[in-house]
Amino acid sequence: MIKLGSHVSFKAPDYLCGAIKESLDNGANCAMIYLGPPQNSTRISVEKYHYEDYLAKYSSQIKAEDIVVHAPYIVNLANRSKQEFAIDFLVAECQRANYIGIKYLVLHPGFHNNLYPVKEALDILVFGLKKILEQTKDITICLETMAGKGSEICSNFEDIKYVIDQVNNDRVAMCLDTCHIWDAGYNIKDYDAFKKYLIDNDYLKLIKVIHLNDSLNDRASHKDRHANIDKGYIKLETLKRFVHDKDFDNIPIILETPRTKDWSPYKDEIKTLLAK
């Protein structure tokens, strides 16, 4: 079954109920939320989530396991001097996600900030992930493929697989972002060759969430600028291949394409992507 949705607002007064209603209004059957502003660590009490209302009204239409939580951008688990804060915050974030019954939390792997070689930053990330897993249960942390902007780590599949192998726990997996891997240099427009690459290198089985975005920039730009579907360099034909690929059935595919305060593309984009 295709699971297709988008990032939706998790905000007062209705929080979870409002987010899932927005998703259903867009024709989605999955969703992604931030449990607070993505730029900071401010969080409300779980008692304000309207979780019981969600259970009563919407849980039969979008199950908790089909709601993805995205960790905030400020968390850098690959920086040793900031890792204690990152671990403590992410443990609490996983616990908040557990309250809802979330299955997947997406995490940006971090930056080395020119403080360490890439390999050392990856090992710092491994250490942090192990500490988080020791203090949490159930939820799987999905490391997002990055565009390689600045000192971002994990802009290639090899590095993400290295981290996952070193952690050696089924609760660490991958979130594939189409804009990011395009900007990192992967030619996903040659979809069959790209898919073969994923299979041949044992990357396909690691993917548990997909962020489906077009890119404002050409391949290998390392810019990380999302575009609306078919309005960038990747184009609709390629992005539809991800949606209709049987290997990605039952994996939440999440749109993070640009929207404004007064306009959302998601209803139209979901309809367009689902069309055969």
Curated annotation (Swiss-Prot):
Its cofactor is Zn(2+). Binds 3 Zn(2+) ions. InterPro entries: AP_endonuc_2 (IPR001719), AP_endonuc_F2_Zn_BS (IPR018246), Xyl_isomerase-like_sf (IPR036237), Xyl_isomerase-like_TIM-brl (IPR013022). CDD domains: AP2Ec. Transmembrane segments: none annotated. Gene3D superfamilies: Divalent-metal-dependent TIM barrel enzymes. The keyword Nuclease applies. It comes from the Bacteria. Zn(2+) 1 binds at residues 70, 108, 144. Its EC number is 3.1.21.2. Keywords: DNA damage, DNA repair, Endonuclease, Hydrolase, Metal-binding, Nuclease, Zinc. Zn(2+) 3 binds at residues 180, 224, 226. It catalyses: Endonucleolytic cleavage to 5'-phosphooligonucleotide end-products. It holds the Pfam family AP_endonuc_2. Zn(2+) 2 binds at residues 144, 177, 211, 256. SUPFAM superfamilies: Xylose isomerase-like (SSF51658). It is an enzyme of class 3 (hydrolase). GO terms for biological process: base-excision repair. One of its GO terms (molecular function) is DNA binding. Belongs to the AP endonuclease 2 family. PANTHER family: APURINIC-APYRIMIDINIC ENDONUCLEASE, ENDONUCLEASE IV ENDODEOXYRIBONUCLEASE IV. HAMAP family: Nfo. Endonuclease IV plays a role in DNA repair. It cleaves phosphodiester bonds at apurinic or apyrimidinic (AP) sites, generating a 3'-hydroxyl group and a 5'-terminal sugar phosphate. This is Probable endonuclease 4. It comes from Metamycoplasma arthritidis (strain 158L3-1). The lineage of its organism: Bacteria, Bacillati, Mycoplasmatota, Mycoplasmoidales, Metamycoplasmataceae.
